[in-house]
Amino acid sequence: MKKILFLAILLFAKMALADDAKNEWHNTTLSDATIEKIQAAKYEYKKCVGSEMQKLAYQQQDFRNATDAIMKQCEPVLTKMREIYTEAEVPEVIADRHLKQMRLQTTREALQGMMFSEAARKAGNKPQ
């Protein structure tokens, strides 16, 4: 009985540690042109966020609500980047992870900028 249980545990452990081949990907498979497209889409996303942050309507809102509205406004730009990943046959798991990381990082930066802007307004110094 102990041997059967031991073999079952070993078999289960092997199955649990087996690599999922469809999610396995190596970064060397992307061409330089694809990398440039991804970088261009990332630039467009950050440019969208930056231009939205400059709008007066967002400057007058609470910084949390304004940041949320800005991120929702620029979300379609990330769709273009997702399409680039799909065309390059990058697994969805990896593409989603990168997009989530970039979205979170940009949200943090925008939130920090909006907090600074609001603090400067409350202090009486208007940023230029």
How would you name each of these model-derived features?
Residues 13-18:
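N-terminal signal peptide c-region/cleavage motif recognized by signal peptidases
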Residues 64-128:
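Compact alpha-helical subdomains of small soluble proteins
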